A protein has these predicted regions:
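Short, flexible, surface-exposed loop segments at domain boundaries
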Residues: 2-9, 22, 26-209
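Sec-dependent N-terminal signal peptides
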Residues: 11-20
Length: 209
């Protein structure tokens, strides 16, 4: 299915509450058997949610104890500075590695998904979650050196690159019309997600990852 794709990334740390603050999301938030869903909340009936994917498919989920929810709100290039921990989907072109989007992680989420691995936002894209070691400003944006366990990478962030951060959210933020990014575990026929991580855009924000 378009925009729904397996990705070999890490497992959520479990927690007791269904709807939790970001302080409980400090461990890796991706599950090894997860798929990615990008789309819009089509309907909500109690805990049952239907997502219309960007590819036009419907996929369902029931929000319960196996789900973790985070809000997504705008950030800016000025937030990408030395010492912060970020995640960026990026692609390599003739000029180097170019950011497709950037997530500035709150300090309490430092270390989330650390590393550099394949991603499915664009063909041949990667996700790099790492500490910002150096930034170089220019009229074309900012070039950042990212350091993670076992390696480092230099990525250019253009002024037009979507930049966001995570905020606290609850089930009430998952409402019709909200944009979402989901890393979830599918049932055998792929029509339902049974557990995972749901990032919901707040105040009209689209999760860019």
């Amino acid at each position: 299915m378009e925009n729904i794709m397996k990705n070999p990334i890490r497992r959520l740390r479990s927690g007791a509450a269904a709807f939790i603050t970001l302080s409980c999301l400090t461990g890796p938030v991706w599950a090894a058997d997860s798929i990615h869903v990008r789309g819009t909340v089509a309907s909500v009936e109690g805990s049952a949610v239907t997502i219309k994917t960007n590819g036009g498919k419907d996929i369902g989920l029931t929000i319960g104890d196996d789900w973790r929810i985070a809000g997504v709100v705008p950030a800016s290039l000025s937030d990408v500075k030395k010492g912060v921990f970020i995640g960026t989907a990026n692609v390599q072109d003739s000029s180097g590695n170019r950011a497709l989007e950037v997530v500035v992680f709150p300090e309490k989420m430092r270390g989330t998904g650390e590393g550099d691995y394949g991603w499915d936002l664009k063909p041949k894209s990667s996700m790099t979650n790492a500490n910002v070691e150096q930034t170089v400003e220019s009229v074309d944006g900012s070039t950042v050196t990212l350091k993670y366990k076992g390696g480092e990478k230099t990525v250019t962030i253009a002024p037009s690159t979507p930049i966001v951060t995570f905020a606290d959210a609850t089930k009430d933020d998952v409402k019709p019309g909200a944009k979402v990014f989901i890393s979830g575990t599918p049932n055998p026929d792929g029509t339902m997600l049974t557990k995972g991580f749901l990032a919901v855009g707040k105040d009209g924000t689209t999760p860019p990852m």
